[in-house]
Amino acid sequence: VVETPRRSMNKLINSNDSVKRTIDEAFMIRAIKMHLAPAVKEEHLAEIVKNATLEKFDANQELFKEGDQGDSLYLIRSGSVTVSKSIGEKNTTLAYLPAGNYVGEMALMTDMPRSATVKAAVSTETIVLKGEDFRGLLSKNPDTRHQLELLIAQRLEQNKEKKSGHGEGLV
């Protein structure tokens, strides 16, 4: 293990695009493995990460809007987001999600429009996985797919409770 001061490391990362991309890819693999697909081997994740991008959002900027067609999954690298939904005439905040969480998987797995609007609560950076790469990951990893299907079923039930006014569900 080599310890490098943060300032020196940031200077190195920003000095060369290929160094920055290599370090970003290593981070993306680790983040996806830790938060989204723990059972998937790193070499399989490396293929997906080649197409992944990092996207920054300012506070209050939308990642996506309720009703949009889903084309990507967003893993929150830094910052946080709010998840809200139109219920009747009112816009209701369903959840506040900090770094390490992900959004957008429901639309990708169900082929339905986005079920909620997601906005950056503060300056936020995300790892963006394209829908086709995410679906490819799930098709090769049925255990990961099953875990996400269970989570989606739970979120849909919580959304239904929230919409009827009987719950404090999270999305």
Language model features: what each stretch is:
Residues V1-V171:
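Cytosolic regulatory regions built on CNB/CRP/Popeye-like sensor folds
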